[in-house]
Swiss-Prot record:
Catalytic activity: (6R)-5,10-methylene-5,6,7,8-tetrahydrofolate + glycine + H2O = (6S)-5,6,7,8-tetrahydrofolate + L-serine
Protein name in UniProt: Serine hydroxymethyltransferase
Lineage: Bacteria, Pseudomonadati, Pseudomonadota, Alphaproteobacteria, Rickettsiales
Subcellular localization(s) per the UniProt record: Cytoplasm
EC main group: transferase
Main function: Catalyzes the reversible interconversion of serine and glycine with tetrahydrofolate (THF) serving as the one-carbon carrier. This reaction serves as the major source of one-carbon groups required for the biosynthesis of purines, thymidylate, methionine, and other important biomolecules. Also exhibits THF-independent aldolase activity toward beta-hydroxyamino acids, producing glycine and aldehydes, via a retro-aldol mechanism.
Quaternary data: Homodimer.
InterPro entries reported in the protein's UniProt record: PyrdxlP-dep_Trfase (IPR015424), PyrdxlP-dep_Trfase_major (IPR015421), PyrdxlP-dep_Trfase_small (IPR015422), Ser_HO-MeTrfase (IPR001085), Ser_HO-MeTrfase-like (IPR049943), Ser_HO-MeTrfase_PLP_BS (IPR019798), SHMT-like_dom (IPR039429)
Source organism of this protein record: Rickettsia rickettsii (strain Sheila Smith)
Length: 420
């Protein structure tokens, strides 16, 4: 076998078929998973480039390997572009994921056993914010704050009370399932009162922050972490930002050699391409459309009688509370999947069901907005979702309705282009 002459379909027919089938799946469903998006062909091309061959431990101009001249240029471009995008002084584009970006901040600023204060999982927080099964919950004394039991909004008074009581070394703002804006300035006030560090995890809302559609944490947080996919529409990966260059030096050392070895230079190049796309005027229009579409989706579900957590959304996330409907999140997500609508089961604040079952579903608009969906299309999507949920309330067998909605999905999705 001559590896330099064979294409994928010649070398590995099984993987080639899997990719073909996945392309068909992605092209034919309404994608409502809030953490997913579609990258541009340019980003795909960059992350499939031969930069994957290059080892580049260290940082630009300070590598442990020779032959890094070109990958240095790529990483410097990514750094400068993302600093411009977020108007900050420091950026590290090497984290392999958002989780590893968070871990690097912990390694830079904390010692094992230090107290961290983050949002609980059922309130919309992330595993890496102190959840018991995660490294952040095992290595540190993790304390969680919740949302208000009546409004389901972040309770800043409760956060301040917990901070005064537990004196955390690090306060974390950020979420994986919270549909409203965050007051980063208020978090900083609390941090300053107790002498803690402040980390903002903007993995979900990075695109909103970059375009000015959400308050930026850069002036307030000691460190800001994010993924580079989701609303940034780049390759899967992470990044760390700050205006404190001294903390930036600590984070650099924590990430390499503390946490990671060689960076993924093909992914960093793809990040640079995505950041260039994010700097274009049309990207702001895209983010505005993402938000408008989410509001339209939420309103259409409310019109059909479904409870939307917090009564609506300020971002790209719509959380549907199914408790009064007698439907589990798992049942709803699986039925929607069979109908060609992909989402995920999701815990609702103070959820008493198993995290593998849940009492709600999480819906998001970034992916379908990338394909060109507008408000009127998401109104239709909302009614499709409601039709499936209505069927689950009234019938044990939802298969006929699932097929009917699948036919509607197929007609709608064919109107919007996908990769050639």
């Amino acid at each position: 076998m001559n590896i330099f002459n064979n294409n994928l379909h010649e070398t590995d027919k099984e993987i080639n078929e899997i990719i073909k089938h996945e392309k068909l799946r992605q092209s034919s469903v309404i994608e409502l998973i809030a953490s997913e998006n579609f990258v541009s062909p340019a980003v795909l091309e960059a992350q499939g480039a031969l930069l994957t061959n290059k080892y580049a431990e260290g940082y630009p101009s300070k590598r442990f390997y020779n032959g890094c001249e070109e990958v240095d240029k790529a990483e410097n471009l990514a750094i400068e572009r993302v600093k411009k995008l977020f108007n900050c002084k420091y950026a590290n584009v090497q984290p392999h994921s958002g989780s590893q970006a968070n871990q690097a901040v912990y390694l830079a600023l904390l010692q094992p056993g230090d107290t961290v204060l983050g949002m609980s999982l059922d309130s919309g927080g992330h595993l890496t914010h102190g959840a018991a099964p995660n490294m952040s919950g095992k290595w540190f004394n993790a304390v969680s704050y919740s949302v208000n039991k009546e409004t389901y909004l972040i309770d800043y008074d409760e956060i301040e009370r917990l901070a005064d009581l537990h004196k955390p070394k690090l306060l974390i703002a950020g979420f994986s399932a919270y549909p409203r804006n965050i007051d980063f300035a208020k978090f900083r006030e609390i941090v300053d009162k107790v002498g803690a560090y402040f980390m903002a995890d903007i993995a979900h809302i990075a695109g909103l922050v970059a375009t000015g559609e959400h308050q930026s944490p850069i002036p307030y947080a000691h460190a800001v972490t994010s993924t580079t996919h989701k609303t940034l529409r780049g390759p899967r990966g992470g990044l760390i930002l700050s205006n404190d260059e001294e903390i930036g030096h600590k984070i650099n050392s924590a990430l390499f050699p503390g946490l990671q070895g060689g960076p993924l230079m093909h992914i960093i190049a793809a990040k640079a391409v995505a950041f260039l796309e994010n700097l274009q005027p049309e990207y702001k229009s895209y983010i505005q459309q993402v938000i408008s579409n989410a509001k339209a989706l939420a309103s259409s579900l409310q019109e059909r009688g479904y409870d939307i957590l917090t009564g609506g959304t300020d971002n790209h996330i719509v959380l549907v509370d199914l408790r009064k409907d007698g439907i589990t999140g798992k049942l709803a997500a699986n039925s929607l999947d069979r109908a060609g609508i992909t989402c995920n089961k999701n815990a609702i604040p103070f959820d008493e069901t198993s995290p593998f079952i849940t009492s709600g579903i999480r819906l998001g608009t970034p992916a379908c907005t990338t394909r060109g969906f507008k408000e009127k299309d998401f109104v239709l999507v909302g009614h499709m979702v409601a039709d499936i949920l209505d069927g689950l309330k009234n019938n044990e067998d939802n298969s006929a309705l699932e097929q009917q909605v699948l036919n509607e999905v197929t007609k709608l999705i064919e109107l919007f282009p996908f990769y050639g």
